[in-house]
């Protein structure tokens, strides 16, 4: 995150990169993500541990997308991965569904759009390269609903886990991006 001068370690980005590379790990990841399932803990933790050990994470990092389960949180603790703050962005499922199912990605250059918040000039066509805009499989409505079910079943318990450790910070996700960013920075004690 630029304001904090530390890297954002996004498991989603790392997993999509693994899928793009077509490795055996990438094929496993693709199966899970295409079906709205969580990627197994051991795969996620190996990827994360390798990433946070890199030199650009020496002064801190932001974990995005992990931990998602209580065993992952406990395993990160056991591996000595220090987590100072956990930010939970609170928002209604219907809003999440609308945001995710409205996303479109250029099949050629990877540019991102949203049919409501950031529509292309011409429906279905990338403004930058005129490539076709597609819906990622993990943004399909049925996949999004399944991911939300999995979140409520497996991930929501982490709020209690981190609250007991005094690390949980709740942020209203229904506000503007700028407002949410400012609230996050305040919640973790950064200067706004």
Give short role names for the model-derived ranges:
Residues 1-192:
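Glycine-rich phosphate-binding loop of ATP-dependent small-molecule kinases
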């Amino acid at each position: 995150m630029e304001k904090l001068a530390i890297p954002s370690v996004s498991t989603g980005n790392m997993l999509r990169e693994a899928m793009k590379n077509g490795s055996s790990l990438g094929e496993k990841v693709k199966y899970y993500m295409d079906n709205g399932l969580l990627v197994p803990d051991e795969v996620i933790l190996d990827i994360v541990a390798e990433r946070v050990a890199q030199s650009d994470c020496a002064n801190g990092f932001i974990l995005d997308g992990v931990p998602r389960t209580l065993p992952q949180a406990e395993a990160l603790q056991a591996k000595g991965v220090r987590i100072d703050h956990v930010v939970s962005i609170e928002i209604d499922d219907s809003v999440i569904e609308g945001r995710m199912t409205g996303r479109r990605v250029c099949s050629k250059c990877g540019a991102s759009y949203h049919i409501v918040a950031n529509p292309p000039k011409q429906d279905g066509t990338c403004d930058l390269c005129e490539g076709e805009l597609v819906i990622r499989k993990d943004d399909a409505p049925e996949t999004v609903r399944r991911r939300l079910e999995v979140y409520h079943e497996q991930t929501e318990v982490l709020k209690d886990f981190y609250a007991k450790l005094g690390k949980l910070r709740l942020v209203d996700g229904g506000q503007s991006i700028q407002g949410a960013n400012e609230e996050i920075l305040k919640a973790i004690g950064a200067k706004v």
